[in-house]
Amino acid sequence: MDSDDDYNGPADTNPRLEDEESDLDEKYPNRPRNHSTTLPFHVLFQTLFYPLSEIKKKPAGPARKKVGPHGLSSVNLTPLEKRRDIIDRFISRWRKEVGDDIYPAFRLILPDKDRDRAMYGMKEKAIGKLLIRIMKIDKNSEDALNLLNWKLPGQTTTSSMAGDFAGRCFGVLSKRPMRTEVGDMTIEEVNEKLDHLSAASKENQQLPILTEFYRRMNPEELMWLIRIILRQMKVGATERTFFDVFHPDAENLYSISSSLRRVCWELHDPNIRLEAEDRGITLMQCFQPQLAQFQMHSLDRMISRMRLTEDDPVFWIEEKLDGERMQLHMDSNDSVPGGRTFRFWSRKAKDYTYLYGNGIQDENGALTRYLSDAFADGVESLILDGEMITWDTEQDAIAPFGTLKTAALSEQRNPYSSTTRPLFRIFDILYLNGRDLTRYTLRDRRNALQKSIKPVYRRFEIHPYEEATGKTEIEEALRRVVEEASEGLVLKNPRSPYRLNERHDDWMKVKPEYMTEFGESLDVVVIGGYYGSGHRGGGLSSFLCGLRVDDAHSSQGMVASKCYSFCKVGGGFTAADYANIRHHTDGKWHEWKSRKPPTTYIELAGGDAQYERPDMWIKPEDSVVLCVKAASVAVSDQFRIGLTLRFPRFKKLRMDKDWKSALSVQEFLDLKANAERERKEKEFNVDNSRKKRAKRDNKKPLAIVGYSAEAEAQYTGPSGNIFEGLNFYITTDSNTPVKKSKAELEQLVKANGGKFFQTSNAAPSTICIADRRTVKAASLQKSGNVNIIRPSWILDCIRQSEIDAGLPDSLLPLEPRHVFFATQDKKEEIAASVDRFNDSYARNTTNDELKEILKQMSKDHHFHASQNPKIVRKLNERIQEKVNAGWEMPSGWLFKGLTILFPQNDKVDDAEVDETSQTHQQYRLNLARNTVRFAGANVVDSKSSSVTHIVVAPGSSSSDVSSIRKSHSAKPGKKVPHLVTAEWIEECWKQRTLLGEEGFQPSRGT
């Protein structure tokens, strides 16, 4: 049971726990009771976690050391069926040997879904420190350093599991276990101790509890216990799989209640289904909200997912807010002061009622005290979905998300002195006066919201949206987002219902930071400023920037200090940046007067129309220089250059430069020409990192994907933290894939957080680097106990860190190509990072690497891999999982599952087409056949009951079309295949998605 008290010893001595148990009996009078003691803790990983993890592993690579107990009996099952079988066996055993209350086990199996146990407040480093104390290890020893620096790769077996804290703990614990055999702790005992641990807030309270675990568990048990504490199980099965096996209504009940306890206790009998009235959301019961799908590779594809119709061809655009997702429940209650009761829950089901208030007259509520007149007459109860943000009353703008809790606490203490306050922005209503609205369309729900709420200015407001029909509106909205430094956009389908606990295409995120930046940083001069509105109101929030006019673009006699307008920059500024700009330009701004523009200093586009004219202007000689980056360069008649930056973002203020050393018009044109020679300019490209992460998951769930050839050519040495805490001894320069001197490699290490030394033993866990056999390298190799890594690993890690900007830093695992010399115990781990053709599981190969891999592959290998039905079936399942989660369909899988019939002899009516046309039509048909065959379709040339599509030859006569229609007319119980032209295949391939067949049917008149 939960407890907010400090650890006080056994649970049965705590009266509060007894009271909580009594309350639970009252709340769940029909709760199940177990007839026997719970199973031993070790049964969880022996019969559940390990077998599930074995299915998760990829069959390629070295032989597996462990085989699940059901491996032989489930050979012919799909991975999903195997997972279900393992889970079902465990649940059946529990019901037979323990009883119907499986909640104690599920709390440990799905710890991240257990909202009834408080967070432990313990991260990896805190656990590592406690283990060092418990095992009495010297804090400067190698094992202690391995625990504290668990993200770093090491040279020994103990430290080899970089990034897996629990695995590294296992290595250290195995050297000094209290017991080697599994312990005798039951699942119930473990839960009891974990309840105490979650209530312990100080290290001296946590230490005796972990010591008890250490005394009674072996290293393997402790490894899984640590994963439970960190809520990082990763056993190869999601909660949906567990719920689905446990009870057909389990996932639905969890979605509407967020309560693992309620799922286990109310659905303990799989034969009793939820009543219809129990399947919807309930007032004062936290539910799992709908989430927005991740951004796809193109706006056109995203718009297609909005399912526009001829009668209703619109979708909605909302600003994505930088706050905390929050649901508000309100119920009328005459027995409480103010007549209304409130509850607040976050997306993670954390109760925030204590912070925002439980009633109109709750003096500790940072929000509810202002809501006495916030609801329309007749509104008795409702549930609202929205975002809690921080509002800066002085700037009249959104404040950073990290200040939300501080603002709420400040509002609690003194509502009159605070400059920031919580603001609840509402974008949906899901329940109104006893009626569940989730099945209604978003448009209908919005109408209900407008009629139910009376906004309270800057405290309780309805989030606005705008209607759109195409990507032009999205691009324009993105420009505003960047200018105002907002979070991003959300596209919504107004015809959609609300989907509980689901990330669906009806809502899709668009964030400007996903976009590929124009490769160079540009130093531009501020020549104008625009007053902000909304979030950035009250001051100059965005700036007009210009390029210095040089001799090549100056008119005769023109003043040298003139600038051409080039772009508007409003994204990326912090409050400190704005203050710094104000400080250096104070008193130098002038109001822009349209009738008397300052053409001596600034030239806009449009002549007298004065395109993009600013509110204020400043002389270039009085101004500052900004360093900006952008998505790309685009043609524009809105700026004097004729070009502009798409989605520019401020990087830093260049106080080391003045307007004379800023970028000139000619310098920019030269820079653009050079960039275009290196790569073709792309419009509105989504960052490759998302696509590459999708490919990574289709191979093997290791740490990181690799770098691209393009990144290799452009790389100039970014700064980062990928090597933070690592020590390097670099003995040679780099020969491949690019030449780098020893000094350059050392500077790269330093620039990315690492340290370098000139001897191998100057610091603990030093990584030795060499690319050729020198005296130093030979000496290290001769010792036989040091791994020597090639410089290519450093370069690969840095490039990947740059690609994955914004994601947690994680080092690439070592591949054979990265290793100059490896110790015997390291060789197996290194070999496991690639397949038999040396194709990395964790890194995308470059074009040159792929060519070499293909050269090594024999035809027999190719045939074996492509024809193995188990491999194909497994690959199909994994690809489908990713596509369902929003990833782009791989090109080679586009027509997978379809059976397509092509006409025999590919004949056309000779009377209707000449020889040249017939040859072209024959070519189109052959190309269509090869395309679908490549993209996974089953191509047939004769009638079959499994045919899904029939391709009609170009130029077919009306009689041919009629004959085909007649021969494939529907029979009872059979579906009619689609008749399509070759154009359907061509367009599907072009759009990389399966299009509707309706627009590609052969004409009835042909």
UniProtKB/Swiss-Prot annotation:
Q: Which GO terms describe its molecular function?
A: ATP binding; DNA binding; DNA ligase (ATP) activity; metal ion binding
Q: Which residue range or ranges hold the BRCT domain?
A: 718-811, 890-1002
| Function of the molecule | DNA ligase involved in DNA non-homologous end joining (NHEJ); required for double-strand break (DSB) repair.
Required cofactor(s) = Mg(2+)
What keywords are annotated for this sequence in UniProt? ATP-binding, DNA damage, DNA recombination, DNA repair, Ligase, Magnesium, Metal-binding, Nucleotide-binding, Nucleus, Repeat
Protein name, UniProt field: DNA ligase 4
- Species of the source: Aspergillus oryzae (strain ATCC 42149 / RIB 40)
> One Gene Ontology cellular component annotation?
nucleolus
Q: Which NCBIfam families match?
A: dnl1
GO process annotations (BP): DNA biosynthetic process; DNA recombination; double-strand break repair via classical nonhomologous end joining; nucleotide-excision repair, DNA gap filling
Residue positions annotated to bind ATP are: 318, 320-321, 325, 387, 427, 487, 492, 509, 511
The record's region (Disordered) falls at: 1-36
| Catalytic reaction(s) noted | ATP + (deoxyribonucleotide)n-3'-hydroxyl + 5'-phospho-(deoxyribonucleotide)m = (deoxyribonucleotide)n+m + AMP + diphosphate
Similarity remark: Belongs to the ATP-dependent DNA ligase family.
Lineage start: Eukaryota, Fungi, Dikarya, Ascomycota, Pezizomycotina
What EC number(s) would the UniProt record show? 6.5.1.1
What the entry lists under SMART domains is as follows: BRCT
Q: CDD domains from the xrefs?
A: Adenylation_DNA_ligase_IV, BRCT_DNA_ligase_IV_rpt1, OBF_DNA_ligase_IV
The record's principal subcellular location, in a coarse class, is nucleus
Q: Which InterPro entries does this chain map to?
A: Adenylation_DNA_ligase_IV (IPR044125), BRCT_dom (IPR001357), BRCT_dom_sf (IPR036420), DNA_ligase_ATP-dep (IPR000977), DNA_ligase_ATP-dep_C (IPR012309), DNA_ligase_ATP-dep_cent (IPR012310), DNA_ligase_ATP-dep_CS (IPR016059), DNA_ligase_ATP-dep_N (IPR012308)
Record's subcellular location: Nucleus
Top-level EC class? ligase
List the catalytic residues: 320
